[in-house]
């Protein structure tokens, strides 16, 4: 059971307070994008995500563009959003960006009934995913490590 924190008259759970802190502590050379409640199985999305991890953004876009998987189109849009966040919000150059981290978490499951013989029924779980892509500027990251 979550405890409720009262902040400025609003009720917020501990999760929301912690999430706000983690968003504020992102480095200045890092941007991220999250697609939540995507109607694709996490297992199917992970195969696509693993292929772009650690690659330059342009190379990752090429891999996703020519992939025939459904998850590739979704991950392409999330990556595009992360790059837009980096260029517009942080002023980073797209040429120096690379996919620093990307992962897929399980979302909620929609349960459906599939009628079977003799009056029985099976439950089908339609899975959802939360897809996160984090991009970093390679040059600015090296500058901060050198200091």
From Swiss-Prot:
Query: An example Gene Ontology cellular component term from the record?
Result: cytosolic large ribosomal subunit
Annotated signal sequence is none
> Which of UniProt's keywords are assigned here?
Ribonucleoprotein, Ribosomal protein, RNA-binding, rRNA-binding
Q: Which GO terms describe its molecular function?
A: rRNA binding; structural constituent of ribosome
Biological process GO terms, please? translation
Q: State the source organism's domain of life.
A: Bacteria
Q: Which residues form a coiled coil?
A: none
Per its UniProt record, what Pfam families does this chain match?
Answer: Ribosomal_L22 (PF00237)
Under the heading InterPro entries, the entry gives:
Ribosomal_uL22, Ribosomal_uL22_bac/chlpt-type, Ribosomal_uL22_bac/org-type, Ribosomal_uL22_CS, Ribosomal_uL22_sf
* Known role: This protein binds specifically to 23S rRNA; its binding is stimulated by other ribosomal proteins, e.g. L4, L17, and L20. It is important during the early stages of 50S assembly. It makes multiple contacts with different domains of the 23S rRNA in the assembled 50S subunit and ribosome.
What protein family is recorded? Answer: Belongs to the universal ribosomal protein uL22 family.
**Assembly description:** Part of the 50S ribosomal subunit.
Report the PANTHER family cross-referenced here.
Answer: CHLOROPLAST 50S RIBOSOMAL PROTEIN L22-RELATED, LARGE RIBOSOMAL SUBUNIT PROTEIN UL22M
NCBIfam families, sorted: rplV_bact
The name under which this protein is listed is Large ribosomal subunit protein uL22
Organism source for this protein?
Fervidobacterium nodosum (strain ATCC 35602 / DSM 5306 / Rt17-B1)
Taxonomic lineage: Bacteria, Thermotogati, Thermotogota, Thermotogae, Thermotogales
């Amino acid at each position: 059971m979550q405890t409720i924190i009262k902040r400025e008259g609003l009720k917020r759970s501990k999760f929301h307070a912690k999430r706000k802190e983690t968003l504020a502590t992102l480095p200045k050379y890092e941007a991220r994008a999250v697609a939540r409640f995507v109607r694709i199985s996490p297992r199917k999305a992970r195969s696509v995500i693993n292929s772009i991890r650690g690659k330059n953004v342009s190379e990752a876009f090429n891999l996703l563009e020519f992939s025939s998987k459904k998850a590739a189109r979704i991950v392409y849009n999330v990556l595009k959003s992360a790059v837009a966040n980096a260029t517009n919000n942080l002023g980073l150059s797209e040429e120096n960006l690379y996919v620093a981290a990307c992962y897929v978490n399980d979302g909620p499951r929609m349960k459906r009934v599939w009628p079977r013989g003799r009056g029985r029924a099976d439950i089908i779980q339609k899975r959802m995913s939360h897809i996160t892509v984090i991009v970093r500027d390679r040059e600015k990251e090296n500058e901060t490590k050198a200091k």
